[in-house]
Amino acid sequence: MPVITLPDGSQRSFDHPVTVYDVAADIGPGLAKAALGGKIEGRLVDSSYPLEKDTKLTIITERDMDGLEIIRHSCAHLLAQAVKALYPEAQVTIGPVIEDGFYYDFAYPKGFTPEDLEAIEAKMRELVEQDLSVHRELKSREEAVSLFRRMGEEYKAEIIASIPSEEEISLYRQGDFVDLCRGPHVPSTARLKAFKLTKVAGAYWRGDANNEMLQRIYGTAWPDKKALKAYLHRLEEAEKRDHRRIGADLDLFSIQEEAGGGLVFWHPMGARIRRVIEDFWQERHTAAGYEMLYTPHIAHEELWQTSGHTDFYRESMYQPMEDDHQLYQLKPMNCPFHVLIYQGRLRSYRELPIRWAELGTVYRHEMSGALHGLMRVRGFTQDDAHIFCREEQIENEILGILDLTLEMLAAFGFDRYEIDLSTRPEKSVGPEAIWEQATQALRSALDKKGLDYAVDEGGGAFYGPKIDIKIEDAIGRKWQCSTVQLDFNLPERFAMEYVAEDGARHRPIMIHRAVLGSLERFFGVLIEHYEGKFPPWLAPVQVVVMSITDRQEGYARQVEEAMRNKGFRSLLDLRNEKIGFKIREHILRRIPYLLVIGDREVANQTVAVRTRYSQDLGAMSLDAFMEHLSVDVARLGHNISEED
């Protein structure tokens, strides 16, 4: 009979088969009431899951991240049940958990309105009050297909046909609603009390623009109403900070329908910021011992066959183009190009480590439904770098990468982050000894830097372990930007070599790394982090000079010219408008400093200084203000605020 081992090492013995719920009840009534499910050998299961043999068990409650996933998964089914109750002609398709919530796609040609969402949410709450038990059922493939076809759910029948034959078919039933799902789910609808439907959007079936357009209803769910309220507040903040709206308001960038989705046009103000970022990036990389590269945008398809991209990355690549009976491929990554430069001649151990960096434009095939402003695009510039080194040099190179990465992120105002170390997966390439040495080098570098990190056992790529850094923005969202990835695969595929001290030839270790990731995506994160109020060193216009009347035009021109000659990004506003109107307009443009020139300033050869927060800093000499601005611009990572 089963002996159940709990996370603290304690054990519970039973003389008959039990469920996860039974174990929780044996521990105590409080845990039984809180239990949402269990975790066995890394797999989430329902609270009704039978335990017939000795096993290790973790009881999952709403306090666990896994519990939150169960809640959200169950809310997706609750949403589908409510839609079917109100709109029986709608067909259900898929409803997964996503970050901070869930969605469900419906085939419903009429489309859902905001009023429909209110009615659906009200129905969901009604179903919660009914306290419907949730049960798992196993069906044969034929039974499941027959059931859903009788219900008129053709999409579900299609999904079942795509499930591997060795997988069991499980359904979940609550009340008169049944859905196809692996689970797990909460034991009762009464456990779902803190949720909100947020929006409706279009989505193609299976993400393919050639398929039917579906209606996607998004929602969020949390353990309690307090957490839900906090999230909805963050959501309001996120909407205010939406980079697409701010980008249009400040004329930073656009995506033109005539050119196609996911292709970014940088406007003059956005291009200024990009140039500042690129110059800073190149300066810091040069100081860290990197050499800059430029590589082509296309290459023979054979190159991508050698690198393995056509085998492992084909779905993210565009179709090849033909010229003179030769197929060419747009590059999805820069790595093979850097390898070709390395292969240009035989390398000596004395040359290693080699550090090469490139702001290289790459192209990824993305479904139109997945595109999102600057955050998900088809053509973007990667801040790529590759290091070729010996095994014993790995740790020092990782230390250097971490120094450079954290310094650069701090300069952009990001000093809070999460770090993950991902280790060898079950399927991998390369000798076990090198994997162990490389993983230990990554771990040791993180430890020497005193950085907190989580270990994702088995989460590395098949070709090497990696470090991922997620930055946290002003409203607490996490963004994956920086990556350090060891690669034992490409050196083998390209037969890369260097001549060692003893004259023998060896494979170099290859390290891929990105600090910012995609420039486009990082710019989108910056816009939302600062709400368009960029720090002075990044602002496209750092100071605007405004005259009150045309009597001050000559002096205003002198002031603006002096600013420009000092290297500041300045703007001159001599329009025949009221000064209050000008000030309000430039505050809306988020310009850090506003200089007002009136008769008094002309007479005293001063400037009246204001900030974009309407703070009046008083009159200053031009030299004093330029010194003030110089100090501000030099303070990387600092931004002026309402308190300054």
Swiss-Prot record:
<dbReference type="InterPro" id="IPR004154">
    <property type="entry name" value="Anticodon-bd"/>
</dbReference>
<keyword id="KW-0436">Ligase</keyword>
<dbReference type="InterPro" id="IPR033728">
    <property type="entry name" value="ThrRS_core"/>
</dbReference>
<dbReference type="Pfam" id="PF07973">
    <property type="entry name" value="tRNA_SAD"/>
</dbReference>
<dbReference type="Pfam" id="PF00587">
    <property type="entry name" value="tRNA-synt_2b"/>
</dbReference>
<dbReference type="Pfam" id="PF02824">
    <property type="entry name" value="TGS"/>
</dbReference>
<comment type="function">
    <text>Catalyzes the attachment of threonine to tRNA(Thr) in a two-step reaction: L-threonine is first activated by ATP to form Thr-AMP and then transferred to the acceptor end of tRNA(Thr). Also edits incorrectly charged L-seryl-tRNA(Thr).</text>
</comment>
<protein>
    <recommendedName>
        <fullName>Threonine--tRNA ligase</fullName>
        <ecNumber>6.1.1.3</ecNumber>
    </recommendedName>
</protein>
<dbReference type="InterPro" id="IPR036621">
    <property type="entry name" value="Anticodon-bd_dom_sf"/>
</dbReference>
<dbReference type="Pfam" id="PF03129">
    <property type="entry name" value="HGTP_anticodon"/>
</dbReference>
<dbReference type="GO" id="GO:0046872">
    <property type="term" value="F:metal ion binding"/>
</dbReference>
<dbReference type="GO" id="GO:0005524">
    <property type="term" value="F:ATP binding"/>
</dbReference>
<dbReference type="InterPro" id="IPR047246">
    <property type="entry name" value="ThrRS_anticodon"/>
</dbReference>
<keyword id="KW-0067">ATP-binding</keyword>
<keyword id="KW-0648">Protein biosynthesis</keyword>
<dbReference type="InterPro" id="IPR018163">
    <property type="entry name" value="Thr/Ala-tRNA-synth_IIc_edit"/>
</dbReference>
<dbReference type="InterPro" id="IPR006195">
    <property type="entry name" value="aa-tRNA-synth_II"/>
</dbReference>
<dbReference type="InterPro" id="IPR012676">
    <property type="entry name" value="TGS-like"/>
</dbReference>
<dbReference type="InterPro" id="IPR012675">
    <property type="entry name" value="Beta-grasp_dom_sf"/>
</dbReference>
<dbReference type="GO" id="GO:0006435">
    <property type="term" value="P:threonyl-tRNA aminoacylation"/>
</dbReference>
<keyword id="KW-0862">Zinc</keyword>
<dbReference type="InterPro" id="IPR012947">
    <property type="entry name" value="tRNA_SAD"/>
</dbReference>
<feature type="region of interest" description="Catalytic">
    <location>
        <begin position="242"/>
        <end position="535"/>
    </location>
</feature>
<feature type="binding site">
    <location>
        <position position="512"/>
    </location>
    <ligand>
        <name>Zn(2+)</name>
    </ligand>
</feature>
<keyword id="KW-0479">Metal-binding</keyword>
<dbReference type="InterPro" id="IPR045864">
    <property type="entry name" value="aa-tRNA-synth_II/BPL/LPL"/>
</dbReference>
<dbReference type="InterPro" id="IPR002320">
    <property type="entry name" value="Thr-tRNA-ligase_IIa"/>
</dbReference>
<dbReference type="InterPro" id="IPR002314">
    <property type="entry name" value="aa-tRNA-synt_IIb"/>
</dbReference>
<keyword id="KW-0820">tRNA-binding</keyword>
<dbReference type="GO" id="GO:0004829">
    <property type="term" value="F:threonine-tRNA ligase activity"/>
</dbReference>
<dbReference type="InterPro" id="IPR004095">
    <property type="entry name" value="TGS"/>
</dbReference>
<feature type="binding site">
    <location>
        <position position="335"/>
    </location>
    <ligand>
        <name>Zn(2+)</name>
    </ligand>
</feature>
<comment type="subunit">
    <text>Homodimer.</text>
</comment>
<dbReference type="GO" id="GO:0000049">
    <property type="term" value="F:tRNA binding"/>
</dbReference>
<keyword id="KW-0547">Nucleotide-binding</keyword>
<feature type="binding site">
    <location>
        <position position="386"/>
    </location>
    <ligand>
        <name>Zn(2+)</name>
    </ligand>
</feature>
<keyword id="KW-0694">RNA-binding</keyword>
<keyword id="KW-0963">Cytoplasm</keyword>
<keyword id="KW-0030">Aminoacyl-tRNA synthetase</keyword>
<comment type="similarity">
    <text>Belongs to the class-II aminoacyl-tRNA synthetase family.</text>
</comment>
<feature type="domain" description="TGS">
    <location>
        <begin position="1"/>
        <end position="61"/>
    </location>
</feature>
<dbReference type="GO" id="GO:0005737">
    <property type="term" value="C:cytoplasm"/>
</dbReference>
